[in-house]
UniProtKB/Swiss-Prot annotation:
Its cofactor is heme. One of its GO terms (cellular component) is cytoplasm. The active site is at H128, N201. Decomposes hydrogen peroxide into water and oxygen; serves to protect cells from the toxic effects of hydrogen peroxide. This is Catalase HPII. Induction: By entry into stationary phase. It is found in: Cytoplasm. One of its GO terms (biological process) is response to oxidative stress. Homotetramer. It catalyses: 2 H2O2 = O2 + 2 H2O. Pfam families: Catalase, Catalase-rel, Catalase_C.
């Protein structure tokens, strides 16, 4: 049993101190107070150890989660056994000939344990290896039966389980979350008609037009083959060499170099289906559609210095934020949006709907929000659910169909092929996380890791010995068999691109012109940083030349940062034409249209010994009322005592929970001298200021203005007052809703943090 200090029952001591006690396998080692168990209710980020989803949210259920109950294995109150069920008496020592003699080969317990360990890892995904996932549900707002016969979109009362995986693209499974990269946004709908996978990204387009170039693009962006550098980054020669030679990449590169490439969290990130798909209604009428996910928490990003520092200070930042948000009850929510284009309008635009490097501007075709997805439960086991999840754009249900997008067509082959390689064979659909919730029966048989036991004596069709079961289902308006859309197709066999795919610069220009001034600065900074890592000068020059074909102002700014002088020819390049006459589309900017609120955000409160209790209580009350989480920080762990004797537990140190991980900083009034000379506290405020975060200083905490070199009274983004009254907190919360103090940008270059 745990040994408790007599004076402090909450102080735990190690139960093992010497070799005579090195047999813990039969003892209870948990604290008697039960503090090792998670609370089965929402808790603020970091307040308790994280827990498997079924322990933290046992009452959160849906049809898919219920089906997973059959394969979940808890170990509490069970004997330790081998994989064959044999109880183990000693799990501490190998079988030896004498206590100092050789280990015996007959030790089947050792052999099984080591062999299994040696084979625990499976091949990671070629791309999107680094990812995090969550369970949830989707519910449409109304029946969409006029445009699709898909059952899960036909009834506003129908709730469909989902499993969503977010990911980066370039880096390996152990790379950092906050690198500059495109993010994957893959959703598995467990519908009553089968599985539908919407396998998208956080950009509405991709780098290439034809799947034939996918291996080349991925080879170029991945670590360079001769030395496997860099990890989780595109800032290297081979990627930019490819970009400079393939202008079709430029549109998605613009998105990656923008703030979209460094999202604040998965909760504040849009998702897109990338390709044009078809919706088919019961009458067989088709409508082109592009899919969108709109985050209800609003859109937000990191800033580049912050993203870089997080790769070292908290490389799991996005994974942690997603997990802790769900545990806190701040469920990520997204609205599913459709851009609908009637078939007769296929050639209405000056770009091709089948081109995956082109988007459909929302100014031309508004997004119709048709339903909501809520992520409300974490996985129980990262490997079993996240790593073994197999998404596939070819997983569709009646009411949906493909188009002739050449990138999509190649993906339909690639995903099956890679799952067979990664998950060991063709039966990856039988892994619990991948199983549909509806029945499935066919004549596919055998193969590696087959789970089901087929009792049908006929493994072919047609057959008479099992009365021809399972049988085909005719197409129908409801619960019918899948029927491909009857599109007329004709043409000669050729290897060529459609001329309608041939314009590469108008869409990147539209994206550039749609950004706010500070977002444009960030794009320039993104290109400048990445290209500064490119060793070969001619590659840098070629990329700048490509940028000159998009926008001269952009090219000049990047060229200046790289020490490149534009030629007269480059200075006189004619700008590309507008996209369907459109010069700007505010939906392409993260910040042109304010959205979202402060619920689920995190504020750091830098405490001092003898902090004014009344101020702190007012601060905590105001934050709680808006669903904002507070972290009490100090120079050391333990407790501090307020001016009225209240004892306050410390959540983390100034260094342990850096300003990178919070959205705003408050320093309440009190004994400020206690932390005034603390380097970590001063750096905390300086760094938060540099990263454009709101800062609130109450009473004598205003002395910290000198730290960040603020002399002016009333600078935007700095809230100051004699005490933390209602107006003090209202001003701070208003600033937080804007996410950053963008007006501060001209000042931050002087901040050394």
């Amino acid at each position: 049993m745990s040994q408790h200090n007599e004076k402090n029952p909450h102080q735990h001591q190690s139960p093992l101190h010497d070799s005579s006690e090195a047999k813990p396998g039969m003892d209870s080692l948990a604290p008697e107070d039960g503090s090792h168990r998670p609370a089965a209710e929402p808790t603020p980020p970091g307040a308790q150890p994280t827990a498997p989803g079924s322990l933290k949210a046992p009452d959160t259920r849906n049809e898919k989660l219920n089906s997973l109950e059959d394969v979940r294995k808890g170990s509490e109150n069970y004997a330790l056994t081998t994989n064959q069920g044999v109880r183990i008496a000693d799990d501490q020592n190998s079988l030896r000939a004498g206590s100092r003699g050789p280990t015996l080969l007959e030790d089947f317990i050792l052999r099984e344990k080591i062999t299994h360990f040696d084979h625990e890892r499976i091949p990671e995904r070629i791309v999107h290896a680094r990812g995090s996932a969550a369970h949830g549900y989707f519910q449409p707002y109304k029946s969409l039966s006029d445009i699709t016969k898909a059952d899960f979109l036909s009834d506003p009362n129908k709730i469909t389980p989902v499993f969503v995986r977010f990911s980066t693209v370039q880096g390996g499974a152990g790379s950092a979350d906050t690198v500059r990269d495109i993010r994957g946004f893959a959703t598995k709908f467990y519908t009553e008609e089968g599985i539908f996978d919407l396998v998208g990204n956080n950009t509405p387009i991709f780098f290439i037009q034809d799947a034939h170039k996918f291996p080349d693009f991925v080879h170029a962006v991945k670590p360079e083959p001769h030395w496997a550098i860099p990890q989780g980054q595109s800032a290297h020669d081979t990627f930019w060499d490819y970009v400079s030679l393939q202008p079709e990449t430029l549109h998605n590169v613009m998105w990656a170099m923008s703030d979209r490439g460094i999202p604040r969290s998965y909760r504040t990130m849009e998702g897109f289906g990338i390709h044009t798909f078809r919706l088919i209604n019961a009458e067989g009428k088709a409508t082109f559609v592009r899919f969108h996910w709109k985050p209800l928490a609003g859109k937000a990003s990191l800033v580049w210095d912050e993203a870089q520092k997080l790769t070292g200070r908290d490389p799991d930042f996005h994974r942690r934020e997603l997990w802790e948000a769900i545990e806190a009850g701040d469920f990520p929510e997204y609205e599913l949006g459709f851009q609908l284009i009637p078939e007769e309008d296929e050639f209405k635009f000056d770009f091709d709907l089948l081109d995956p490097t082109k988007l459909i501007p929302e100014e031309l075709v508004p997004v119709q929000r048709v339903g909501k997805m809520v992520l409300n439960r974490n996985p129980d086991n990262f490997f079993a659910e996240n790593e073994q999840a197999a998404f596939h754009p070819g997983h569709i249900v009646p009411g949906l169909d493909f188009t002739n997008d050449p990138l999509l067509q190649g993906r339909l082959f690639s995903y099956t092929d890679t799952q067979i390689s990664r998950l060991g064979g063709p039966n990856f659909h039988e892994i619990p996380i991948n199983r549909p919730t509806c029945p499935y029966h066919n004549f596919q048989r055998d193969g590696m890791h087959r789970m089901g036991i087929d009792t049908n004596p006929a493994n072919y069709e047609p057959n008479s010995i099992n009365d021809n079961w399972p049988r085909e289902t005719p197409p129908g308006p409801k619960r019918g068999g899948f029927e491909s859309y009857q599109e007329r197709v004709e043409g000669n066999k050729v290897r060529e691109r459609s001329p309608s795919f041939g314009e590469y610069y108008s869409h990147p220009r539209l994206f550039w012109l749609s950004q706010t001034p500070f977002e444009q600065r960030h794009i320039v900074d993104g290109f400048s940083f990445e290209l500064s890592k490119v060793v070969r000068p001619y590659i840098r020059e070629r990329v700048v030349d490509q940028l000159a074909h998009i926008d001269l102002t952009l090219a000049q700014a990047v060229a200046k940062n790289l020490g490149i002088e534009l030629t007269d020819d480059q200075l006189n390049i004619t700008p590309p034409p507008d996209v369907n006459g459109l010069k700007k589309d505010p939906s392409l900017s993260l910040y042109a249209i304010p959205d979202g609120d402060v619920k689920g955000r995190v504020v750091a409160i830098l405490l001092n010994d003898e902090v004014r209790s009344a101020d702190l209580l007012a601060i905590l009350k105001a934050l709680k009322a808006k669903g904002v989480h507070a972290k009490l920080l100090y120079s050391r762990m333990g407790e501090v005592t307020a001016d009225d004797g209240t004892v306050l537990p410390i959540a983390a140190t100034f260094a342990g929970a850096p300003s990178l991980t919070v959205d705003a900083v408050i320093v309440p009034c009190g004994n400020i001298a206690d932390i005034a000379d603390n380097g970590d506290a001063n750096y905390y405020l300086m760094e938060a200021y540099k990263h454009l975060k709101p800062i609130a200083l109450a009473g004598d905490a205003r002395k910290f203005k000198a730290t960040i070199k603020i002399a002016d009274q009333g600078e935007e983004g700095i809230v100051e007052a004699d005490s933390a009254d209602g107006s003090f907190m209202d001003e701070l919360l208003t600033l937080m809703a804007a996410h950053r103090v963008w007006s501060r940008i001209p000042k931050i270059d002087k901040i050394p943090a």
